[in-house]
Amino acid sequence: RTPEDLLKQALRYKPYWKNGGGITVSGGEALLQMDFLIEFFKLAKAEGIHTTIDTAGNPFTREEPFFAKFNELMNLTDLFLLDIKQINDDKHRDLTGFSNSNILDLAQYLSDQGKHMWIRHVLVPTITTDEDDLRKTKEFIDTLKTVDKVEVLPYHKLGITEWERLGIPCLLYTS
């Protein structure tokens, strides 16, 4: 599909959008598709459509060429939905295999640039529910100037059957 095809498809649903509505792009990971999204969001903005990116933030870096493309995409984006899985870097590495430093840097950068964002945090029992970590998450969010909403989401087991179908043990699930 082309950006034009996707916009044409999205516009079919415009009569159902309330209060103006808009387009939210999620993943996989939306920031891995920046070239496509830049073209898609240019078309959407030409139609006056509100644009949102749902991201885990992991690909973010200030290194080129990523950073220039990100800035172009950021300027076409009205709202970012950003997941903060774990504020503690060591625990984040244990949970995801990656540092959270680039995710926290993205949140700070978006705030510094005046970009609106919603922060989401999933409560996974014994993994992301430590009181000290939750307090530090709140303290970090309090430093951000453009957070419009914080969503604390309960962990659910809806993906378990997919893990089982793929023959991969889901380490987050205990019966």
Regions found by a protein language model. Name each.
Residues Y173-T174:
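Conserved small/polar residues in nucleotide/adenosyl-binding loops
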